[in-house]
Amino acid sequence: MKVSEKLLEQTGIIGEKIELGAFKYLSAAFVGSYIHAGNKIASLTGLSENFDKATEVSKNVSMQIAAMNPIALNEDGVSKEVIEKEIEIAKDQLRQEGKPEEMLENIAKGKMKKFFKENTLINQQYIKDSKQTVTDYINSEQQGLDITGFARVSLG
């Protein structure tokens, strides 16, 4: 069934016009999902393989995505523009704190490590166990497992 056909079908059921505001497609060996209470946030997680606990693991990672809203899977997924902007913000803050110019680059690199840890999915602290990263969690469930992609949609 096409998306347009499903929308038309649902319009007939609920009696109100439905408009599609966003559409995300994710292809992986296994794709799992999570819809947050209130149906305002939904997320998908692609895993590199299907295994016994794939549904549970992908739901937990999708919950992480809904809660923490990562901007990329890993450092390579963060655009050059975002990186440059964050470095400039860090340097400006350091200048305001009176740090010497020759130290700015090294301190900014440290701040970028923190930025990547907080904003890239595989490096984030796992919300159900802050002693682990998301990578640690998935590898504890299935050695060699990778997250191949993710998507997050929110209403409002």
Q: Which role fits each region the language model picked out?
A:
Residues 1-156:
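N-terminal assembly/interaction segments in proteins that build large macromolecular machines
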